[in-house]
């Protein structure tokens, strides 16, 4: 697939992040920026998320952030992005079945209730299927 999951350091500056996205787009890849809520240069900067998506990047947030498991700030920011339909994927950030178990159900149920069934289906089912099939979102 031409989709690439990008992870940056939490303290990387915006220009570095934007240039990384630009470089991948220039080579014909579709960058998916992992857990945007963790990057200090993006936190509470919805306009920067809009800039990146306008360039062609896709946005992924963690289910735990949406549900407030990692603090109010990340919860608030991810929900702002969801409200504006700037999120393309929700993931677990699971590394194992104990410490960070893969739990999506509560988050999926919340998104269906708050933002609608179609948007939830897109970010949990349709968009991931497009990635696997190497199809344009």
Model-derived segments and their meaning:
Residues 18-21, 44-50, 72-82, 106-107:
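Charged helix-capping and loop-helix junction motifs
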Residues 55, 85-86, 116-119:
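A short helix-to-beta-strand connector/capping loop
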Residues 67-71, 97-102, 132:
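Short active-site-adjacent structural elements
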Residues 86-102:
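Short acidic/histidine-rich active-site segments
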Residues 1-58:
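Extended substrate/RNA-proximal surfaces in nucleic-acid metabolism proteins
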Residues 27, 84-85:
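Structural motif
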Residues 9-11, 36-39, 62-68, 94-97:
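Active-site beta-loop-alpha junctions enriched in small/polar residues
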Residues 104, 108-137:
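Mid-to-C-terminal alpha-helical segments outside catalytic/metal-binding sites
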